[in-house]
Amino acid sequence: MSAYKQRNLGIISLPTDIKYRNWSKELTKRRIENDSQLEQYIKYDNKYQLNKNTLAVYEFKQNPILGKYKAVAFDLNRGIVLSQKSTHAMMQGLMRHAVHCDMIWQRMLAREAGVDIYQGIVMYNVLYFSMHAFSGNFFTDWICLHWIKDFHVKRHDQAIFNSIALDKNGLVYNFAFDSPKPNLTKIIGQYLFHNHYYSDLYYQHMLQENNLRVTAINSDSILHNSNYYVQLDLYAVDSFKKLADKFYNHVLNLHLLTIVKEFKPLDYLHREHHFFTKQIIKIRYNR
């Protein structure tokens, strides 16, 4: 087996032999438990979190690999990462360290357009998609659409995602997921459109406010293929500033409620926050 070096990707640490190009949950478990050739590509990391180099993640909480590993991530730079933590923990790490504040805004945008807010995590031209909604118990498989070229649903019982070419020789991985949602194609199309709109807002904001031109990774991924988009109702805002103004009160209340929950015994905080909220709004809107 070998590893390839490609501009922008560095060393690809996943196995590249043809027999290791196709993956599913069943194949992943069987190979890790029985194929000694994979050992050199396996890493153990209970603190692993989703990142832009993650291709896909399979959840094994109900049937742990080797009796203890509850999640497996395919990472271009790290290789095949096994964790005793669930995919819930991997996703929570991303939420805490990368997109926690940003999630408030993008979820509000998603609600405006009628998108299921618990089906994916959108960053700037980076899209983590949950094969089953991650609300509730959070235990679900993930596919990272910014590395995906195309996908198809096979007989309504399996969805197969094909990656973009990852090196000059056309290295492609295929990830299969069982029991996809009946309307999976529509949901993904909505999220792709949502990502397109949100990323464009972000690009314009960075250009106008900071004079920065941010570039997208993987311009040949499905994120930039409008043929897959499912058009949503037009958003009611066309800039981050208008978005902030539109949702200011909601975000402020959410922030204050979070603080109050952290200090439950201090009931007087409810009164104090109510007072300061009114003052802040007066100052902001010159009331």
Feature annotation, model-predicted:
Residues 1-142, 151-287:
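Eukaryotic intrinsically disordered, low-complexity regulatory linkers and tails enriched in Ser/Thr/Pro
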